[in-house]
């Protein structure tokens, strides 16, 4: 039976640790590296609900995209390990139930076939290539040019968005940049690369002020990244066929829209 360490190393052969941002926290973050794994739960985040789902389904390992702990987001919480905090409660429950956690974040964003390639594929982009040297983001073209309203409807349907925010630029959609998760900082690069549209998430008000003709679409953090989970599942099944791998059904987008 495969161990947590063996699974981590196999995932790193797809999405190397070295390709993660220097502030990121990736790899095996919780549990015994020599623990044998019979069942894996794949999820975008490791929340209380996801941990309970892992307990209920008998998983020894959760493979997530977002790190269960990262000093960039959890600096104060990481100073203690208390079950009465959100992070402390998650970590305590994982350890008590001998459930390990492997997290593949910005290294999976950058990986061939990772988050951004999955997002580009889901949106039907062709001739996909890198948006930037960091490999966070992709550019591709639609088979046929579309009007913005038609493309917005496609994004909602294909990604399962509850809604989206957007700013009209040229109003036509053909050459599209994508950035799963928070990629507003790459708007100038999308413009410089001649894109007419950029699909990403977590955009600020100021991001929408100077788009210079770019159709800017905030499709949500969860919808733009959750597309990678089936690919992670397929990768694990290919390399560890003896291990049962399932995608979380309890974890959904926590952001809702009132229209």
Language-model features and meaning:
Residues 1-259:
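Active-site catalytic microenvironments in core metabolic enzymes, especially phosphate/sugar-handling
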């Amino acid at each position: 039976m495969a161990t947590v360490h063996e699974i981590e190393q196999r995932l790193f052969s797809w999405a190397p640790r070295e390709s993660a941002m220097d502030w990121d926290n990736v790899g095996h973050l919780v549990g015994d590296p020599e623990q044998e794994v019979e069942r894996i739960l794949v999820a975008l985040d490791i929340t209380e609900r996801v941990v309970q789902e892992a307990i209920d389904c008998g998983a020894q390992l959760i493979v997530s995209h977002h790190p269960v702990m990262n000093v960039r987001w959890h600096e104060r919480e990481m100073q203690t390990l208390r079950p009465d905090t959100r992070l402390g409660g998650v970590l305590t429950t994982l350890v008590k139930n001998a459930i390990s956690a492997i997290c593949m974040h910005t290294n999976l964003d950058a990986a061939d076939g990772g988050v951004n390639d999955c997002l580009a594929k889901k949106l039907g982009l062709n001739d996909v290539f890198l948006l930037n040297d960091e490999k966070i983001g992709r550019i591709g073209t639609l088979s046929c040019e579309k009007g913005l309203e038609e493309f917005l409807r496609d994004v909602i349907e294909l990604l399962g968005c509850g809604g989206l925010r957007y700013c009209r630029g040229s109003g036509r959609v053909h050459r599209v940049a994508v950035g799963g998760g928070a990629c507003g900082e790459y708007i100038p690069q999308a413009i410089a690369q001649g894109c007419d549209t950029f699909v990403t998430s977590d955009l600020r008000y100021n991001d929408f002020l100077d788009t210079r003709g770019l159709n800017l679409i905030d499709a949500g953090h969860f919808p733009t990244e959750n597309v990678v989970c089936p690919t992670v599942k397929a990768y694990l099944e290919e390399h560890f066929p003896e291990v049962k791998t399932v995608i979380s059904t309890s974890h959904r987008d926590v952001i809702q829209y009132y229209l």
